Amino acid sequence: MQFSDDLLVEKNGPIYTITFNRPEKHNCLSVSMQKELHEAVRAARFDEDARVLIFRGAGNTFCAGDDIVEFPQLASRKLSYDSATALPEPADNPSTNGFLVTSMFQETAAMIENLIDVVTIAAVDGVCMGGGLEITLCCDFVLATPTSRWGMPEIDYGLTPGWGGCTRMQKVVGRRRAREINLLAYEFTGRQAEEWGFVNRLVEPGDLEPETAELADLILSKSRFALRRSKYVLRYAGDVPIGTAAAFELPIDPGAGPRDVDGFAAFTNKAGSLMDLRKRSSALWADQRI
């Protein structure tokens, strides 16, 4: 599909980049943008060449979530969800529009979380609240600036999160922290977000884009087969008891898929490509925290 100027979708080889592009509104998501986001993620999902999907925001800010200015229109049916999607016209219940919007974004969030063949990265600067924060909960990696602003303000608007703010968040930061963030609706910094487990790594604002690009390039250097299988286990084994989860790892052995002969030789000889990859990972990820 054709994407509007509010959502920029770029494909550079195996790397997709989705940019929220309403900086004058902190990149909040209109109904039409949510439809486009769904289609953009779907495009990456079914692209056999896609290996990395990056989410970022224009104008030094990530995403402030829903465009709440549209909420009264949704409730009064002046803004039909059908105008932005292929779903049928809402039923008699005026709240149906909002229900369909939330359902669509829940599907989008689940699709991001379940991208087994594609590694997802959120690059966060500025505002990351509401639905923007919920998008990061679905991603494999989150890079953020120390001064980025995080929060779940829905309760102060008489709303409840619908895209994983209550559900996924508990798995990321625990039940008590999730209650604190959702029920009190206070704002916290990127540094706090890292301490609490929302963020993998903090980077300075000027380094966010190059560090994100370097991480994407590092991911591309890994075995696609091994990444796919590892993501599958990491995604689904965590939802079942450990005894059951162990079964997910049974087929994953050195004989289960294509072997990287050079990689095995490097491991044996402590030299070559494998050692180079480990040094590169350490240089990028472990040795340069701020």
Model-identified regions with their sequence ranges:
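Conserved CoA-thioester-binding segment of acyl-CoA-metabolizing enzymes
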Residues: 1-58, 73
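C-terminal alpha-helix plus adjacent terminal tail
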Residues: 1-13, 62, 80, 185-190, ...
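Terminal peptide-recognition signature
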Residues: 18, 22, 36-37, 55, ...
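Glycine- (often His-adjacent) and acidic-residue-rich active-site loop
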Residues: 57-108, 158
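Hydrophobic alpha-helical segments typical of transmembrane helices
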Residues: 104, 108, 165-168, 177, ...
